[in-house]
C-alpha cells in the first residue's frame, strides 16, 4: 500500500520538475453553490494535465539499467505526454502506443516531446495490449497510467499541496478514471486529516470504479463514449480499487450534458479551460453535491481539450440558454419579402448570423421560399418574443434549435 511518506518522497523527487499549481478561489462557483470553492489548477501543469507527476516519479525510481532499456506506455493523450516529457528529461527512449482515434493534436504533441508514437487499435485496450507486446519484445519498462505505486505516489503530491495551501479544507473532489489520481490524493488527505471528505467523480457513461465498488472487486464495464475521455477507463486497477475502497468517502457520476455545461461554465464564468475529465468535479458540485457552507477543493485535472470540441460545446450551450436560435419560416417569393422579415427581426433586437434561402425543397409551396435564420438572441424570453411577434404578423414559425 501507499503511505504518506511515499508521497512526501515523491514531492521531493518532483521539486523543480513540475509546477506547484495554484489552488485558486472561485468567487463565481462559491456564489452559485453556497460553498467556499477552490480550484486546483492542474490544467496549467506541464503538458496540460497532472500526469507528469506520476510518470516522472515512476521513471525516477528506475535503475540505470532499466532506464537504458527505455520505457513504453499506452495512452490516448495525457499519460502519453506525461511519459514522453519525463523520458525526455531523463534522456531515455520512450515508445507510446496510442489508439488510431487519438486526436491528431495529442499525437503531434507526444511526438514533439521526443517519443516514438505507434498507432495501434481502435480503442485504448487494444493499444494497451500492443504496448505490453512491445515491452515483452524489447525489455522496455512499462509505465502504467494508474495501477503503479510510484505513479500513485506522484499523483498524491496534489493532495499534499492542497493540504499545505488550504489546511482547513473540508471536502476534496477528484475526477476518477482508473483511480491513480484519487488513490494518491486520498492517501495524502486522509493521512494528514481523516476528517476531510474525499469524493470521487466519474461519468455515467463509464462508471467502472462505481460499479466495481458495488460489486466488491475491480470489474470491467463496457460503457459508452464520453466527453470525459481522460477518465474513460473500463476497469480500475487492483491496487487503486483497494485504495479507493479504503480512503474515499463517496463516489458520484455526472452525465454528458452536465459535463458540457461545466466546461462552458468554467470557460465563460471562471475563465478556466478544462477538458471533459477536468470538468467533472465542477459538474458534480453544480448538480450532484451539496457543498453549501463547506470549504471545498476541486481538482481540475487537465485542460487538453480540442478547439473543435470547445466550439461545439459553446454553440450547444448558447442554443440551450436561448442565446442562439435557428428559426424556419416561409415568405412569398417576391422582391422585398426577405427584407421585410429581416426588418421585423432587427426591430426585435436579434442579430442575424446567417440566412439560408430555399425555393426548391419539396415542402415549399409554389410561389414561396423557405427561410432558415440563425439568430443571436438575449435569452429564452427573447426567443419567445420573436416567435410570438412573427406568428402575429402571419408567419408560420418553427424553432429548430
UniProtKB/Swiss-Prot annotation:
Describe how its activity is regulated: Activity is insensitive to allosteric regulators L-valine and L-isoleucine at low concentrations, while these L-amino acids are inhibitors at high concentrations. Is insensitive to ammonium chloride and AMP. Inhibited in the presence of aminoxyacetic acid (AOAA), an inhibitor of pyridoxal phosphate-dependent enzymes.
Q: Which Gene3D superfamilies match?
A: 3.40.50.1100
- ACT domain residues: 326-401
The EC number on file is 4.3.1.19, 4.3.1.17
Cofactors per UniProt? Answer: pyridoxal 5'-phosphate
pH-dependence of activity, as noted: Optimum pH is 9.0 with L-threonine as substrate.
Q: Which UniProt keywords apply?
A: Amino-acid biosynthesis, Branched-chain amino acid biosynthesis, Isoleucine biosynthesis, Lyase, Pyridoxal phosphate
Write down the CDD domains for this protein, in alphabetical order. Answer: ACT_ThrD-II-like, Thr-dehyd
Reaction(s) catalysed by this chain, per the record, are: L-threonine = 2-oxobutanoate + NH4(+); L-serine = pyruvate + NH4(+)
Per the UniProt entry, how does temperature affect activity?
A: Optimum temperature is 90 degrees Celsius with L-threonine as substrate. Activity is not detected at 50 or 60 degrees Celsius. It increases from 70 to 90 degrees Celsius, peaks at 90 degrees Celsius and decreases from 90 to 95 degrees Celsius.
- Enzyme class, broadest EC rank: lyase
List of residues binding pyridoxal 5'-phosphate: 78, 178-181, 301
Offer an example of a GO molecular function term for this protein: threonine deaminase activity
Does this UniProt record's set of keywords contain Membrane?
A: no
Report the pathway entry: Amino-acid biosynthesis; L-isoleucine biosynthesis; 2-oxobutanoate from L-threonine: step 1/1
Role description: Catalyzes the conversion of L-threonine to 2-oxobutanoate and ammonia. Can also use L-serine, but the catalytic efficiency toward L-threonine is about sixfold higher than that toward L-serine. Also shows weak activity toward L-allo-threonine, but cannot use the corresponding D-amino acids. Does not exhibit racemase activity toward various amino acids, including serine. Physiologically, is likely involved in the threonine-dependent pathway of isoleucine biosynthesis.
- Which named protein is this? L-threonine ammonia-lyase
Q: Which organism is it from?
A: Thermotoga maritima (strain ATCC 43589 / DSM 3109 / JCM 10099 / NBRC 100826 / MSB8)
Amino acid at each position: 500500500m501507499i503511505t504518506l511518506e511515499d508521497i512526501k518522497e515523491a514531492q521531493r523527487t518532483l521539486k523543480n520538475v513540475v509546477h506547484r499549481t495554484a489552488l485558486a478561489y472561485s468567487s463565481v462557483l462559491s456564489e452559485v453553490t453556497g460553498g467556499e470553492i477552490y480550484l486546483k489548477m492542474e490544467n496549467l501543469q506541464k503538458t496540460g494535465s497532472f500526469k507528469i507527476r506520476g510518470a516522472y516519479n515512476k521513471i525516477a525510481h528506475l535503475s540505470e539499467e532499466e532506464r537504458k532499456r527505455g520505457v513504453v506506455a499506452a495512452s490516448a493523450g495525457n499519460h502519453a505526454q506525461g511519459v514522453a516529457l519525463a523520458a525526455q528529461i531523463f534522456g531515455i527512449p520512450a515508445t507510446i502506443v496510442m489508439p488510431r482515434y487519438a486526436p491528431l493534436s495529442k499525437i503531434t504533441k507526444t511526438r514533439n516531446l521526443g517519443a516514438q508514437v505507434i498507432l495501434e487499435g481502435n480503442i485504448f485496450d487494444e493499444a494497451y495490449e500492443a504496448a505490453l507486446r512491445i515491452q515483452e519484445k524489447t525489455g522496455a519498462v512499462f509505465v502504467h497510467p494508474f495501477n503503479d505505486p510510484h505513479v500513485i505516489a506522484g499523483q498524491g503530491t496534489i493532495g499534499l499541496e492542497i493540504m499545505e495551501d488550504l489546511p482547513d479544507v473540508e471536502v476534496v473532489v477528484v475526477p476518477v478514471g482508473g483511480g491513480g489520481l484519487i488513490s494518491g490524493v486520498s492517501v495524502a488527505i486522509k493521512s494528514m486529516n481523516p476528517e476531510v471528505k474525499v469524493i470521487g467523480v466519474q461519468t455515467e457513461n463509464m462508471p467502472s470504479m462505481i460499479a466495481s465498488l458495488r460489486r466488491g472487486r475491480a470489474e470491467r464495464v463496457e460503457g459508452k463514449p464520453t466527453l470525459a475521455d481522460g477518465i474513460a477507463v473500463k476497469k480500475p486497477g487492483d491496487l487503486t480499487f483497494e485504495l479507493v475502497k479504503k480512503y474515499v468517502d463517496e463516489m458520484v457520476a455526472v452525465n454528458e450534458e452536465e459535463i458540457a455545461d461545466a466546461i462552458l461554465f468554467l470557460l465563460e464564468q471562471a475563465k478556466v479551460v478544462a477538458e471533459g475529465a477536468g470538468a467533472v468535479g465542477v459538474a458534480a458540485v453544480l448538480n450532484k453535491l451539496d457543498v453549501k457552507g463547506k470549504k471545498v477543493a476541486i481538482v481540475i485535472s487537465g485542460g487538453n481539450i480540442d478547439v473543435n470540441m470547445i466550439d461545439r460545446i459553446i454553440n450547444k450551450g448558447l442554443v440551450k440558454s436561448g442565446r442562439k436560435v435557428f428559426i424556419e419560416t416561409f415568405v412569398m417569393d417576391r422582391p422585398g419579402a426577405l427584407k421585410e422579415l429581416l426588418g421585423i427581426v432587427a426591430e426585435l433586437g436579434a442579430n442575424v448570423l446567417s440566412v439560408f434561402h430555399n425555393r426548391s425543397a419539396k415542402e415549399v409551396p409554389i410561389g414561396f421560399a423557405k427561410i432558415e435564420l440563425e439568430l443571436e438572441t438575449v435569452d429564452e424570453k427573447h426567443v419567445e418574443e420573436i416567435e410570438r411577434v412573427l406568428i402575429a404578423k402571419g408567419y408560420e414559425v418553427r424553432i429548430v434549435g
